């Protein structure tokens, strides 16, 4: 009996050790399983992009060989019925339209994010932020209709041209990228430690100087991420641009002339491409 009593602590320790080893192996196995699952999904994501890219290159290579890369990229005329394919007007329209959207949307979005994060009353911020996020869920065709009945007539009646123009597309895209820029930039500003702002105040800086000289630079990476996402939205937008841009495959001489972007051209010529 004495020997058994002495063995109990050893047996309990051994049992706990075995249980711990089993639990450790099970945990490691679970982690490895999770890592394997993540790797599989990562490979699927990367592989999907690679397959799409390869498919586009392989399918488009014969057409590029027949048309000529130079004629395709730098041609100034697009007439699919006459087999004239020059996409330079669409490239320039997409670039200029995106730049216009950045000029309009980035300052407004950034200042709105700074206001909501650093200046606005908390109650007001709780009301405005969901309203801004709600704008991100509005369909593109609704934005396009708004541009068609508000922006286009305003440009036509007060500025110049028919209203359906590069300027209308830029203004509309600037409005559409606001929710993305505001939401991401505000999250980046909220993530800046409060001690940065308090330290600037302690050194004698006022509120505005502390925000623009300390908090905003500290959140610059997140702000740039929001701007990049907004630019991606502007470049890829199609339906709203089709409704307000004027649909002219010409290099615009001014911002009051109609244009056709690359994405709009893809959609409008899809029926012709399907018959090739």
Which sequence ranges carry the predicted segments?
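Interhelical loop and adjacent transmembrane-helix boundary motif
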Residues: 241-276
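Membrane-cytosol interface at the C-terminal ends of specific transmembrane alpha-helices
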Residues: 102-104, 110-116, 122, 126, ...
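Short membrane-interfacial helix/loop motifs at transmembrane-helix boundaries
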Residues: 53-83, 250-255
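Generic hydrophobic transmembrane alpha-helix motif, especially the helices
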Residues: 133-174
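Transmembrane alpha-helix signature in integral membrane proteins
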Residues: 2-17, 85-115
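Cytoplasmic-entry segments and transmembrane alpha-helices of multi-pass inner-membrane transporters
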Residues: 31-39, 108-147, 183-184
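Transmembrane alpha-helices
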Residues: 130, 184, 207-244
């Amino acid at each position: 009996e004495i020997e058994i009593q002495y063995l109990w602590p050893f047996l309990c320790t051994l049992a706990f050790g075995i249980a711990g080893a089993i639990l450790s192996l099970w945990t490691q196995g679970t982690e490895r399983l999770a890592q394997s699952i993540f790797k599989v999904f990562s490979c699927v994501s990367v592989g999907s992009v690679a397959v799409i890219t390869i498919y586009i290159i392989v399918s488009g290579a014969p057409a590029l060989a027949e048309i000529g890369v130079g004629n395709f990229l730098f041609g100034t005329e697009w007439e699919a019925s006459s087999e004239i394919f020059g996409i330079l007007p669409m490239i320039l329209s997409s670039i200029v339209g995106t730049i216009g959207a950045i000029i309009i949307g980035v300052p407004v979005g950034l200042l709105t994010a700074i206001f909501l994060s650093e200046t606005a009353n908390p109650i007001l911020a709780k009301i405005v932020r969901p309203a801004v996020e709600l704008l991100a869920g509005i369909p593109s065709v609704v934005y396009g209709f708004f541009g068609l009945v508000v922006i286009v007539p305003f440009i036509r009646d007060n500025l110049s041209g028919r209203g359906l123009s590069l300027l209308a597309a830029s203004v509309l895209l600037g409005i559409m990228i606001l929710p993305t820029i505001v939401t991401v930039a505000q999250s980046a500003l909220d993530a800046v430690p409060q001690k940065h702002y308090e330290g600037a105040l302690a050194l004698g800086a006022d509120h505005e100087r502390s925000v623009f000289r300390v908090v905003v630079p500290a959140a610059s990476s997140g702000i740039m991420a929001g701007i990049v996402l907004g630019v991606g939205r502007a470049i890829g937008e199609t339906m709203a641009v089709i409704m307000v841009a004027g649909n002219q495959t010409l290099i615009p001489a001014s911002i009051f002339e109609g244009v056709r972007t690359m994405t709009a051209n893809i959609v409008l010529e899809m029926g012709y491409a399907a018959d090739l």
